[in-house]
Structure formats: structure tokens, C-alpha cells
């Protein structure tokens, strides 16, 4: 099972302190730390699974997903494929290791949302260009 580090500065972020509801905060932590979140920064899980794991009801989850996507711009949600893309995941969870990049590329075959795959591929390209 992967180890996920959370930057403790998250708890000092004024947006989280002032604007996130308790459900937004909890769901955000769940998305960041779930074993269902791939190395590429995409969580793949139906709402029923998220509800089971978090003990939030589906309406609470949908409300928080909407907040995290539209209000706070932390994620993108693809309802059809049950996938959540964490925006800027790479800033906190990737290194410039070529082995890591190769592992991330392998995880993309599990992602159905083409928009999410393209986002991650663009991010990988930027990382490769930084290493040159």
C-alpha cells in the first residue's frame, strides 16, 4: 500500500481554515490519502465506495465534490468514469526521478477519462523539460 505524505502547512492554509466545510476538509483528506488514488493523482472510486469509506452520505459527498471542483479548484470530477483528478498533485507528490515518471505513465492505463490522461501527460512533459 502506498505511503502518502500530507504537507502540514495544509492546516495553515487560510482557504481551508476559512472556507472549507468540515465535509470538504474530510473529503479532501480522503482524496489525498486514499489507497484508491493512483500515483498519477487520480482517485478511481464510485460514490458508493467513497460513502462507505468516509461514512458521509452521497449528497454530502456530491456537495463537497462540487465545492472542491467549482469553488476551490482543487479537483476535476468525471462522473461517468467515477474518477477524480487532483489538480497540482505533482507539486507535492512527484520527484524528478525518471523511474517515478515511468511508474506514473504506467498508471495512466487505468484511467478512463481522456481529459485526465492528457492533463497528466502534459504535466509529465513539463517535468521532463525541467530535467534537461
Can you say where each PLM-predicted feature lies in the sequence?
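Minor-groove-contacting beta-hairpin "wing" of winged helix-turn-helix DNA-binding domains
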Residues: 82-87
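Positively charged, structured surface patches that bind polyanionic biopolymers
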Residues: 1-79, 90-130
